[in-house]
Amino acid sequence: MKKWFIVILIIVGGQRLFAQNAKPANPVIDSVKAKWGKVKNVNGTKMISSNNIIENIGLSNEYSVLVTAIEDAGLTETFKSKGPITLFAPTNQAFEKLPAGELDTLLKPNHKLDLNYLITSHAIVGSLSVRDIQRKINSNKGEATFRTIAGTTLIAKIDANRNIVLIDDNGGESIISKFDIQQSNGMLHIVNSVLVPKTKSI
């Protein structure tokens, strides 16, 4: 009887010790959420809602071309500002789809205005979620029109695969591949093609 009593004490004590030493599955992420806001995993990069647009896109090499373009266009402070701003952010792969030499030309100092025009053609004043875009599409017979900071027009539609497609002034299409990435100064959506404005030569 004594032996069984001792065995029970050992088991119970061990369980208590394990419970005391147990750690949450994601202690770092949980603490970040509590302190800094929501965390969203975007292709392996953890973007935090308390960061501004520049801070978050700067966390991943996938947006290095966009970051450089924003800097060269003199728009860094714009996308750091309180906003709110909605940015449709092209990935590096999206920029690679541009015709050969166009990006290199845009990044030259004498094309700063053209580059500024291109980047601001991806931005809208206000914080616009995918649900907001969908509602506007549905309330306008399947097509929504948005005015960008550059003054250009973006048309949004829903394709057969239920993707939201943005159409630029040239008829070029870009799919929103990642969406509703909250920023301290607005909203970030990732797009798979560059939206090229029509009225300026690129």
Predicted regions, residues:
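Bacterial Sec-dependent N-terminal signal peptides
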Residues: M1-P24
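Mature, structured domains of secreted/extracytosolic soluble proteins
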Residues: F18-I202
